[in-house]
Amino acid sequence: MRAQPAASHFVDGRPLEDETGAPIPVIYPATGEEIARLHEATPAVIEAALASGARAQAAWAAMRPVERARILRRASDLIRARNEELSLLETLDTGKPLQETLVADWASGADALEFFAGLAPAVTGETVPLGQDFVYTIREPLGLCVGIGAWNYPSQIACWKAAPALALGNAMVFKPSEVTPLGALKLAEILIEAGLPPGLFNVVQGRGAVGAALVTDSRVAKVSLTGSVPTGRRVYAAAAEGVRHVTMELGGKSPLIVFDDADLESAIGAAMLGNFYSAGQICSNGTRVFVQKGIKEAFLARLAERADAIRMGDPLDPEVQMGPLVSQAQLEKVLAYIEKARAEGGRLVCGGEASVSPGCYVQPTVFADVTDAMTLAREEVFGPVMAVLDFETEEEAIARANATDFGLAAGVFTADLTRAHRVVAQLQAGTCWINAYNLTPVEAPFGGVKLSGVGRENGRAAVEHYTQVKSVYVGMGPVDAPY
């Protein structure tokens, strides 16, 4: 099998196999070919990962931040040097075209390692003067963290979680999605090669039961999950039993509002990126595209023209712009949503069919005349299916954009920047864009509100989610006691 790793797991600095665990076949979504076969972590593997992480963390936390940073920076350099090889593996694992993985996946992971390497030595406490006495604070690592990844950006997510955790003195046990398990193993290898002490970043494979075993272990201080809302609810509840720190980056049904003074080509380009990039499998996608009535038909006509020109096919072809969905199960789910949109009265503008057999392909699909009550406007599809809704006034657009239980992201396109800032200030979303969409630089915090999650990935804000504050009162004079 062309992508078979040395072992299913990576624990305490080396590959680890236990074939008594349930098999995990890894399928290349473009052909249905099995490219690797891994095994779920057994209780013994889980214990080895947690024990080695807990054991290694204290010495790592005691290391000077600049020394930790040096290791992470080396890992970032190694990733960049091997970007082509790693991107090929990412394409095999996810089905995303090389045109994407070469620029968006491991590249962002390398950025995260580099950013947090640079930030780590600058994380300091504060001094609070109290006359003769004073208080100083220390930011301390939380300890042993658990990261749980999603299948859409497996390697990027692994890096986004590992980078702040390790930079700030924590250890991490990471469980990738069982659908895309390969990239995290490469990250673990690279970190060891860069000089990371064994045990600090362990990778274990498995389905929900493995995640539950990790999240509920008494040694775990923090859980960071990227996943669906139902999974997030379960993990959040399990973590709450031990009063653990949590970061939850969950699903979305994000609005993209296009006013009639917007640059039409840019707005259409953003809507396409926010619905068709990675075959629509991005949590922050702007899948509810609100277009002001006066430009709706012009918007739809040009959108259909550009969508029909998207080149689909073999993800290993560097000219291909859109690959398959990640699995047969995801294909069936997306096709069911398309049929429901038809049945509920959506006007099909383009696409709407499975495409490019064999493989899990769906055409870029656009429905117009979608109403807020339709399933397509309420539920996360996670596929290349765009819902276009029309609106008349700014106030209407804001109210309807916020009429959802999700709150991950939102976008506004307009030539009036005063209006743009005014609208963004009222949108209930953790991450917003003005005249852009789905750009997530690691320097900026990313995360949602409402059912889309708690906490933030990336940026300086992530420091608060991987450290805790110790407050130290220093008395400089005699103690004045009343007894």
UniProtKB/Swiss-Prot annotation:
- Which keywords fit this entry according to its UniProt record? Metal-binding, NAD, NADP, Oxidation, Oxidoreductase, Potassium
Query: For this protein, what reaction is catalysed?
Result: betaine aldehyde + NAD(+) + H2O = glycine betaine + NADH + 2 H(+)
Any one GO BP annotation for this protein: glycine betaine biosynthetic process from choline
Which PROSITE patterns is this protein grouped with? ALDEHYDE_DEHYDR_CYS, ALDEHYDE_DEHYDR_GLU
Q: Which InterPro entries match?
A: Ald_DH/histidinol_DH, Ald_DH_C, Ald_DH_CS_CYS, Ald_DH_CS_GLU, Ald_DH_N, Aldehyde_DH_dom, BADH
What GO MF terms are annotated? betaine-aldehyde dehydrogenase (NAD+) activity; metal ion binding
Residues of the active site: 161, 249, 283, 457
| The protein's Enzyme Commission number | 1.2.1.8
**Signal sequence range:** none
List of residues binding NAD(+):
149-151, 175-178, 228-231, 251, 283, 380
Reported function = Involved in the biosynthesis of the osmoprotectant glycine betaine. Catalyzes the irreversible oxidation of betaine aldehyde to the corresponding acid.
The record's family statement is: Belongs to the aldehyde dehydrogenase family.
Q: Which HAMAP family does this one have?
A: BADH
How does this protein assemble?
Answer: Dimer of dimers.
Q: What is this protein called?
A: Betaine aldehyde dehydrogenase
Gene expressing this chain: betB
